[in-house]
Amino acid sequence: AAIKQALDSIAANPGFVSMPNGDIAEQIKSGDVIAGISGVWDVMNVKEAWGENYGACKLPTYTVAGKEVQMSSFTGYKMMGVNSYSKNKEWACRLADWLTNQQNQELRFKEKNQGPSNSKAAESEEIKKVAAIQAIIAQSQYGTLQRVGNSYWDACKKFANTVLSGNNGGLSDQEVMDTLVNEITASAVK
């Protein structure tokens, strides 16, 4: 219940606005959003709106039951795979090697500001200067590997809508939290 109350407090703040993924970029460009929480997928939009000197940091802390708690996040990675049963396996392997080589990962970084997965490309001094990548590195100690199914996203969307509406639908805060947990952990097989 304390977590639900903390989230209610955040959502009730007049400076807080929730918006669908993708909308934050448009709101930044229009000047309606001056700070926000998003992912590296929005870096190019942020750079376009705010310039090269934009700032980025790890997620903030918030207060739950009188204690400061660090917001957590999901972490993930990009992976290049090749189907071993492909009739063009050799060409698929060559394409994977080409896409993940140092030169192309450096090009991807330059054009998309995405951190490279190639270890040699990742050693670049230029990467150490990118605020968004440094923020991800700082946040990574609070992250959890993203291994969730659709039941997680559906349950969290329903929970977020409840928090944002300020209406528990007659349920106590604890009942709302219990429903969230039950829906996340429910088997996909019915």
Regions found by a protein language model. Give the residues of each.
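Stable alpha-helical elements in mature extracytoplasmic
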Residues: 2-6, 24, 42, 88-92, ...
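Pocket-flanking alpha-helical
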Residues: 25, 42-49, 185
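Glycine-centered hinge/linker elements that transmit conformational signals in sensory
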Residues: 1-20
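Paired acidic/hydrophobic, glycine-rich loop segments that form the ligand-binding mouth/hinge
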Residues: 34-39, 55-56
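Conserved C-terminal helix/tail region of periplasmic/extracytoplasmic solute-binding proteins
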Residues: 137-190
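Short helices/loops that flank or line small-molecule/ion binding pockets
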Residues: 22-32, 36, 165-169
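Extracytoplasmic/periplasmic substrate-recognition and gating elements
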Residues: 48-111
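Periplasmic solute-binding protein
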Residues: 1, 69, 74-83, 153-164
